[in-house]
Structure formats: C-alpha cells, structure tokens
Amino acid sequence: MPDPKTTAAITAVGTYLPPDRLTNADLEKLVDTNDEWIRTRTGIEERRILRDPDKATSDMATEAARQCLEKAGVGPDDVDCILVATVTPDMVFPATACLVQHKLGASNAWGYDISAACSGFLYALTTGAKLVESGMHRRVLVIGADTMSRIIDYTDRTTCVIFGDGAGAVLLEPTTDGTGLLDTVQYVDGSGVDSLSQPAGGSLRPATHETVEARLHHVQQDGKAVFKRAVVGMADAAAEILERNGLEGNDVRYLVPHQANLRIIDATARRMGIGPEQVMVNIARYGNTTAATLPLCLGDWEDRLRHGDNLVLAAFGGGFTWGASWLKWSYDGTGQGT
C-alpha cells in the first residue's frame, strides 16, 4: 500500500489590524464623495489605517506572525521559512521577510517577498505549500501584509475610498490526513500593467521632483477596466477549481474571496452556484487590504471552521494576476466565529 500523500495544512492563523479607523464620513471631508455612493459601489463602510509614522508593513506582518505562532504553540526558532506577500515593503530592499525574520526572532528561517498585488497571498500560499509538500521544510509562515495608506492619493476619490491597511499570517505544516492545500490554478496577463499600478519608484521611473509632483508614486487605477477583468478572472478561476476536482457549489463550506468589491464577490459566488451564507465577506469593516484580505477572512471565520471543510480561495490583482485554490481545512474552531 503506497504511503499517504503529504500535503501542506494551515495549522494556525494570526491577524493584525491597526487601531485607527477611516470611515466613509471621514472621506466625505477629503474628497467629493458620500457614504451611500461608497457603500453602493464597493460595500465598504470603513477601513483601518496605520498612522504611526515609525511603523510599517513589517511591523504589522510581525504582529500577525507572532499571534499565529502563539496559537500554534510553535516558537520562532522552529520556523523554517517566511514568505511575505506585499506591494508596500518597508523599503525597496532588503525584503520585508528579512525584517520580519529579525523582529520575530526566527533565527533559523530564511525567506523572501512575493509581489503579486491582491493575488500575493494566494501565490505565496502555493509557494509555501510546495516547500512543505516536497519535504524541504516542516514549518512555513505565509504572510499577507500591506500598508496601502502610504501609497494612496487622498485627493483621488476613485482609489482612496477602496484601500485599507492590515496583515494576516498562516502557518503551514505537513499532514497526511487528506486535508491541506489540494489544488491551485494561477494566471498572469501583463497587458494589464496600465490598468492598475504604482507607476514611479522603480528603475523605469526613479523618484524625481517631476514624478512626485505628478503623484506617480501613488496607486493609479482604471476602475472600469479592473472591474471588468476581475469579475471574469476570479469567477473563471473559482469555477475551474470546482470543475477540475469534481466539486459542486454545495460541496463548498466557504468561498474565501479577495475583498476588492462586493459586486465582484457576488458575481464569483453566483458563478460557483453558492449562496451568500457560504461566502466570507468583511470588506465593510476593512476595505481592500490587498495581500492581507484572504488571511484576514480566515482569521475572522477561523472559529466557525471544522476539520474537512472545503474552502475555495480566489483573488485578482494588478498585473493582471489572478487564481483560485482548493483548501481542505485541518482543524476545528471554537464554534463562535466573527
């Protein structure tokens, strides 16, 4: 009889949200918008903002990772690898993962960053899972963290109403009980570069007086183009995961969608044939936290989950990047939930 297959299971979740809230009423004072317009088009009511000028993405990531390890009963020295998904690193280099490794005290871990915008956590989860499945590592921390408030133009109502700050982390460990990350589909289409980007700050447009004055170091978005592609991309990827694995909507306990826009989430759920009670949605409270949305959902719903629950994670981000994963949950929550 062959040995059971080793997969990578999520064994703990940790989250961090800055204490300061930016409400729709607050934004009404900054730009020409209103609460009804924002809620109707995005589903967002408030978002968290990291206001401390001495704190950055690595600090939020470290707090989420620390909570995750404490819940797992694992010490920092027992972590083999740290993967950080982010588009708002503390600095261009070194990698945010290096800073987290130091702040966490994970002296035996190596790691690096993954930049795939709102799909970043999904990509990092796949990468971490392969490190575990291969037998190379036993414990991999996968973190999604972004401080979007630092790259948002708060005079641009098309972007400032959408984004917030936060971090989430999961610990991946090997299992042979049939749970864990079971399948993934991922895609890239680089023709979307001009639809969603931070144009300046890299080697193409390094910082100059001109780039700063032109506000090219802030997020630039063609909202209509992104919405059109995101609706199709997330829904198609989620449907593909079901079809590849002989699953139907009623086999799925929860869809865990990237929290970009409530209308995109609803379209993905309809394509999968699942009801609203099967969808994790916290966008009203946090907005779009980019790479942190998926682990923040897992953190909010962790106590409701049961061993063997089928989850479908789906995301779409700048690039364009998109994909979906089938994850079978590996432990029982407390039964309380968010």
Protein language model regions, located:
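Condensing-enzyme catalytic core mediating Claisen C-C bond formation in acyl metabolism
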Residues: 1-53, 156-228, 232, 236, ...
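Acidic-glycine-rich active-site phosphate/pyrophosphate-binding loop
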Residues: 31-40, 91-105, 142-148, 203-211, ...
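Claisen-condensing/thiolase-fold acyl-transfer catalytic domains that form or cleave C-C bonds
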Residues: 58, 62-65, 69, 88-89, ...
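Short glycine-rich phosphate-binding loop at a beta-alpha junction
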Residues: 77-85, 249-258
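Buried hydrophobic positions in well-ordered alpha/beta secondary-structure cores of metabolic enzymes
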Residues: 10-12, 38, 68, 79-82, ...
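Short beta-strand segments
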Residues: 11-14, 85, 115, 140-146, ...
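Anion-binding (especially nucleotide phosphate/pyrophosphate-binding) glycine-rich loop
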Residues: 71, 75-107
